[in-house]
Amino acid sequence: MMRLAYLSLKWQAMGWLVLGRHAQALAAFDKLLQRWPDDAYGLSSRAHLHAQGGRFEQALADNERWVQVAADNAHAWFNRGYLLESLERYEEALASFVRATELAPKLDRAWYGQGLVLIRLKRYDEAVAALKRNTELQPMSPYGWYQLARVHVDRHNPEEAVKIIRHLRGFEPKVAAQLERETGLLIGTSTR
């Protein structure tokens, strides 16, 4: 009977989400978490809804509980890092992203998050290492490459930024052009 009640609330919430009715979905997750306060799915889902609504403190409260009940879940730590970064609590965010990569070394988003937070903390050498790992894991995603090029410019290492711009031209020419405009590094039309 308990399992049926749980599934009923979970499916209610999911149904409301499919219909785009976030307030009703949130109410269903509230009911679910009243009965099962340590439910990882309910905590993570409600945290996500709060974050979507810009309620980062509430999202963080749910995520903190999620981390407590699922301490070995890399995604819980990644989400915690994201929320802390959104709240400009960069040192705490960094610790969460690091924990996420310890638990799941191939979690590219956590490496990217680390890179962004390290940039905010002006720890550029460490940011380079994190962003390089992100680009190794996601070589065709322009986001890590873009940030890596920006860090190289900030570190007064334009030669490395130029290499990245050339690399990006091969699969993301618009991002390469944006970097050229933003950095003032005009590469020309050569792809070498």
Model-derived features: positions:
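Canonical tetratricopeptide repeat
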Residues: W11, S45, N79, G113, ...
